Amino acid sequence: MRRAAIIGFAAILASFAGFAATEYDVMIPSNTLGVVKVTSAAEYLPLAIGYGAVSAGSDAEARADGLIMTSNLVAGDELFVYDHESGKYDVFGLEKAEDGTATWKSRRVVVISNGGVTVEEGTAAADTVLAPGYGCWLHRPGVASRDDKTVTLAGQVFTGKITVTIAAASGTKAFGQTLIGPPVPSTGDFHLNGGSISWTGAVKGDEIRLAKEDGTYETVKYTGTQWIRYYYENDGGLSRLKKDTDPVIPAGQAAWYARKAGNPSFNIEMEVK
């Protein structure tokens, strides 16, 4: 079975050669089932690999065909998965039978190189292991017109710590980008300053970029000691700059870690509490 680190397909197309291969430490989930719902109108929705497979045993990471519940999805929705061992992108499409049975089917494997983009035949979703602590992209064409915009993730709750490698920038790029998807904690949202992650190795100027429904990003900046989200708020007709000293990655969602150029890759440890 291939072990796949996950990263956003659309962003990689725009920033090819800025991504370095990532590694991860596999955690063994407990026998506690977790469920989280993400409601969003975003067509490209970054989701966290926040749960393990609903099974016991030492090889209990989630698979591409098991993490995302299909009841609120429609035929034609696609899941994009980056395989760091092969450097290729697995694309899975959702198919639904007349009886309502839904199956993730391999659509294609996309290969991106300096020579352009090529497409190969894909492999089964059940054979693609999702790396805990990273993220994946769910593409839902026309989601804005759907009555139900909720995506449900389910699986076994992780315990202990998960190690994720943050990629360095390469070439002339200002940042190296890694899509991180924190394990879903019992408290819900993942607090960046709450001690759940060891930020040893992070540097002033690093950013975490949270996707918004309109396709833009909200930026959280690292000051050297903590993460702060800066935003503007209307105050008596004036737009004033505010700061949030307790920024979070919403439960079940993934976010880009943008590593400032000139700094090496490093590991972060995500602790589930």
Regions found by a protein language model. Give the residues of each.
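A short, polar beta-strand/turn micro-motif
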Residues: G18-A75, E85, A125-K204, A251-K273
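General helical structural elements
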Residues: I6-I7, I112
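Bacterial N-terminal signal peptides
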Residues: I7-S15
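Residues in and immediately flanking transmembrane alpha helices
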Residues: S15-F16, G116
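Fold-core signature of tandem repeat domains
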Residues: L79-V81, F92, L138, I208-L210, ...
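Positively charged n-region of N-terminal signal peptides that target proteins for export
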Residues: M1-A4
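A cross-kingdom feature marking solvent-exposed beta-strand/loop segments within repeated
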Residues: K88-P132, T216-P250
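Intrinsically disordered, low-complexity segments enriched in Gly and acidic/Ser/Thr residues
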Residues: P182-R240
